Amino acid sequence: MGTPPPGFRYIDVHTHLHPPWLWAAIRRWFAGRPGWEFPYGTDPEWVAGFLGEQGVERFVFFSYAHKAGLARELNAWLHETARRLPAGVPLGTIHPADPDVVDVAEEALDRYGFKGFKFHINVQRFHPDDPRILPVYERILARGAVLLIHVGSAPWPNEYDGFPRFERVMHMFPELKVIVAHMGQFETRRHLELMERCPNMYLDTAAAMTARSPLYRDRPDTGPDDVTDGDLVRWQDRIVFGSDFPNTPHPYHDERGPIWERPLPETVHRKIFHDNAHRLLGL
């Protein structure tokens, strides 16, 4: 199609907001890593304003507890931040090492009314099939909530990420509403195959559909072409747009432009950029 119609509105399902102390730690961690220089600010109001200027109607945002003892604090911060951002849709966080992990999850869903959770497996350093969080999956499923999970091995594999343990979770909870971040890179094909058996499994496009993404810097054998036009058409009802903003070292447009350049029917673009997320999240 090439370009969006005038006035087109987006839903971005993958953005990051953190308290200032956590942002500072994250940016320090990335400092000095070639290709991971971030030009964008991190203030929540600024992020919301920027996204609004890009035609973003609603955006999903989250933080993550990288160790025990942080999840309650972060969820309270996310809840308070969401009160100031009418377009924002917060997802909660948990950590399996918290002895009250189920209580934390229930508070996020029932007290704060979060739409679900974000798990970042290789940052939080737990396996997706960790027995301590199986009750959390049960709560997500029972409440019709959504899990956004970074479970692919991109950009830096470690012992916690990867496909097999996530596949095990989906065998246990095949009806779970789940969005796999970054098109499941570097295991995109395996995630696409798993979607055949999991009717509520989605993939988000964040950082995966542009050749400028640092995901591919050290992996020339992978790239946006891992997802074909045929894949986008076949799974047009279960792919959702995400950007990774403001953790994007390239212009925001580069997250959308390569998708618009795919020769897809306008209806497919509308589903990916807006309608699928609107339906899934009940917006």
List PLM regions with ranges.
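Conserved, mostly hydrophobic/aromatic
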Residues: 14, 51, 78, 108, ...
